[in-house]
A protein has these predicted regions:
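Solvent-exposed, polar/charged alpha-helical surfaces in well-ordered, non-transmembrane soluble domains
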Residues: 83-94, 196, 204, 208, ...
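Amphipathic oligomerization regions
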Residues: 642-664
Length: 679
């Protein structure tokens, strides 16, 4: 080897040794103490153990909602360039679709071209204008004159900078994801949950192909199990991931960005009670010593015990479905059962209904369903009461002194008090017959319109409105669930409010007498009707209906809180008035319009059918209200069948409910005691 080259090598090696020695000197002599301190530092890590939500039980301790383990898919922003991120996200969305794991997409534009707006009917009332107005108002650079196609282009070019080359369907997928992720605070810090409760095939594929999905992780979660399928869906509600706005409101209460929260129904109302306390395991790694491990176990949320009887709820829901199927015109309905002694809601049924377990996946389809399955008709639907209001009109007429108990009003088939307005009794319209002389009890039994036309005229609208308010008609009952309607009792003030012309706003004598037979401008919720009938049953006490019986600790079963009967009003009513009205209602099921339904029924009860007109060329709504047993009332029932034609059709639902309540259709099984289920 050349001597010069060898010398050069020696010099380089010598320099390297000098540098190494200098570095060692620096580390030991100059920085030795700081490096020693660093070596003694402890490294800690914390793992969070998610707490399960509290179970929801019926009044006998039978589970309505419990928990199970599942998986969600979360995505965090990484350093991927935008075009690579879009390609990866699209691959993930296709994988989710192909493995049967739906993902949420809240962008209110159709999935496929030609793109159209698809604003959702959030309230289930058939209107989307409020949602559309709100959506546009929250966006600064998107205006109402832009088409759905233009908005897609705007998001592509100016918001998410999505490159060309994607099919219209894939472009819509990507924009939908980016839109939802932005609402969810998608960033390098906050993971966005793109899909909940995914299939095992999804989990397997993502784990096997992890190198293809940078920033994507599979996370264990607790998910709700709805033990009885669609049962009580509108009561129980459901959970879902919080949006950015909810997170800002709740983060100071210990919520994490990807926590699931109650979104509807009891799950939402009792969020603070049902939510558990997460556990933590803290591991401190100490160089040269054993790890220090400290942990706090997760505490499940409290149990919620409802007033609902699972068997009665099931009977009500099945009967609604059965009767809607049997009546060609009927398409929906609701039923409410109350304990007349304390306001417990024993059943609250709606038809059609939905599966709370798949609500998030089915949402777009549900809100576009013309039958409005997510609408809680029992508390939000308002219906013209028809003849079910006649017991209330009778009370107002008797208590105000407008008529007396034995006073007879003659039904000639046509009410001719007014020269220019001559309404008919239903019996005249059907068969050109009359009821003849009627006292108040007979008039209720026979549902004689002519009697109530005259009684209403003599009583006057002010007194009828006053007694309606006494019995809670036209005001919310106070049930714990949101979106309860107030209903409305017909009045001059209301007609003036809704009228669009002076002529429309004018109050006529005909409005008074139409009010007295449950028509005109009166409309109430099924729960209001049930509560007013409960007052007739219990002697005039208006309780606040409630669904929550108690909250109990998941640790030891102790009572955290308990709902006491809350008296909202005590109506003053003479015993003679109650007796006359109750006897009239007894006659309805004994000899009147509901007698065929309840022929030879072993339990005596009192009821009133109602056939309410809802518009020209539309089938009438069918209503039925009742209480039972007659002599010692326990329950009040209200049933509405939309387009059910005749009130006695709704009575069939009430009969099925009473069969279950009184154990007439089966051997009454033993109910499970709540305390047996607690730890």
């Amino acid at each position: 080897m050349n001597k010069k080259r060898l010398t050069a090598i020696y010099v380089v090696v010598a320099l390297m040794l000098v540098l190494i020695l200098l570095r060692l000197f620096s580390m030991q002599a100059i920085h030795g103490e700081s490096y020693y301190q660093m070596s003694q530092q402890k490294v800690s890590s914390t793992t969070v153990e998610k707490a399960p939500r509290g179970e929801i039980l019926d009044r006998y301790g039978r589970p309505l909602v419990s928990n199970r383990m599942g998986y969600s898919i979360q995505v965090k922003k990484t350093g991927l360039p935008n075009n690579e991120l879009n390609q990866m996200l699209l691959k993930l969305l296709h994988l989710l679709e192909n493995t049967g794991s739906p993902y949420q997409d809240q962008l209110p534009i159709s999935q496929n071209p030609p793109f159209e707006f698809s604003f959702q009917d959030e309230n289930g009332d058939g209107s989307t204008e409020d949602e559309k107005e709100k959506w546009f108002s929250e966006r600064k650079k998107i205006t109402k004159d832009m088409s759905a196609e233009e908005i897609i282009t705007y998001y592509k070019d100016h918001v998410y900078s999505i490159e060309d080359g994607f099919s219209p369907e894939d472009l819509r997928r990507l924009i939908g994801f980016r839109y939802d992720a932005a609402l969810g605070g998608f960033s390098a810090v906050n993971a966005y949950t793109v899909a909940e409760d995914v299939s095992m095939e999804t989990v397997t594929q993502i784990k096997e192909r992890q190198n293809e999905f940078q920033g994507v992780s599979v996370v264990k979660e607790y998910y709700r199990t709805y033990e009885n399928g669609t049962l009580a869906a509108h009561i129980l509600g459901g959970i879902g991931k919080m949006n950015a706005e909810e997170y800002q409101e709740m983060k100071n209460d210990g919520y994490g960005f990807n926590d699931l929260i109650g979104k509807r129904g009891i799950e939402k109302v009792l969020e603070k009670n049902l939510r558990g306390t997460d556990g933590k395991t803290n591991v401190i790694r100490d160089i040269g010593a054993s790890d220090e491990v400290s942990s706090i176990s997760a505490i499940p949320g409290n149990y919620a015990v409802l007033t609902i009887d699972t068997d009665l709820q099931k009977a009500a829901e099945e009967s609604l479905a059965k009767h809607v199927a049997q009546i060609s015109t009927a398409d929906a309905g609701a039923a409410v059962v109350l304990d007349v002694t304390n306001g417990d809601v024993l059943a609250m049924a709606n038809y059609p209904t939905y599966n709370p377990a798949s609500f998030n996946q089915d949402y777009a389809e549900l809100v576009q369903n013309s039958a409005k399955p997510i609408w809680n008709r029992a508390i939000s639907g308002t219906y013209t009461p028809g003849s079910t209001l006649k017991p209330l009109i009778a009370i107002s007429a008797l208590e105000s002194g407008a008529v007396t108990l034995n006073q007879q009003i003659v039904c000639n088939g046509i009410y001719d008090y007014y020269a220019d307005y001559k309404p008919k009794c239903w019996i005249w319209s059907e068969s050109h017959r009359t009821h003849g002389p009627q006292n108040v009890t007979q008039a209720i039994k026979n549902s004689c319109n002519c009697y109530f036309y005259e009684a209403g005229r003599l009583t006057g609208i002010d007194e009828m409105d006053r007694y309606a308010a006494e019995y809670g008609l036209g005001e919310r009952t106070g049930i714990e669930l949101p979106d309860e309607s107030t209903g409305q009792m017909s009045s001059p003030a209301y007609k003036e409010k809704i009228g669009t012309t002076p002529e429309d706003q004018k109050w006529y004598p005909g409005d008074v007498i139409q009010t007295s037979i449950g028509q005109s401008y009166s409309f109430f919720t099924p729960i209001q009707l049930a509560n007013y009938i409960a007052m007739i049953a219990n002697g005039g006490t208006r309780y606040q209906p409630h669904l929550i019986k108690s909250i109990r600790s998941s640790e030891d079963g102790s009572v955290v809180s308990e709902t006491k009967a809350n008296v909202l009003n005590q109506a003053e009513i003479q015993e003679s008035t109650l007796k006359a009205v109750r006897e009239g209602m007894y006659g309805v099921v004994d000899e009147g319009s509901a007698s065929k339904t309840f022929a030879n029924y072993p339990i005596e009860l009192a009821g009133k059918t109602g056939t309410a007109q809802v518009g020209k060329d539309k089938a009438n709504n069918a209503l039925f209200v009742a209480f039972a047993p007659y002599d010692n009332p326990e329950i009040a029932v209200a049933v509405v069948l939309e387009k059910g034609e005749k009130g006695y059709n709704a009575a069939g639902v009430a009969k099925d409910i009473m069969d279950e309540y009184f154990g007439l259709n089966k051997e009454k099984g033993e109910t499970v005691n709540y305390y047996d289920l607690l730890p």
